[in-house]
């Protein structure tokens, strides 16, 4: 199933963003349920790649569970975080404030947050023209 205005998914190793072809410019990056099941380096790689490939006024959309003010928003998210860290100590539910610090280093600012079902969030980061 193909849409004319949406590119096919790109498989990328965000822990090695310098190895990714950055010749194309995109309007957005859609990232769903990745930040918490990846090394922190992948979050940094995501915004590094976004800086190189997203057009001015483009955005990065993140979906998944996040902490607010470095605290879990529910007991189920806290338990989920523990389970993730047992599987891999470099995984875990991230604080949105930590993600915001990384995004800002690469010229992206948090524009909007939406609470979603099952204690998840949609976070939209836009690329500042000054980045």
Where do the protein language model's features map onto the residues?
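Conserved beta-strand signature within the Rossmann-like core of class I S-adenosyl-L-methionine
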Residues: 56-69
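Conserved Class I S-adenosyl-L-methionine
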Residues: 73-97
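A short acidic, Gly/Pro-enriched loop at the edge of an enzyme's catalytic core
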Residues: 19-29
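A short, conserved alpha-helix within the catalytic core of class I
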Residues: 37-53
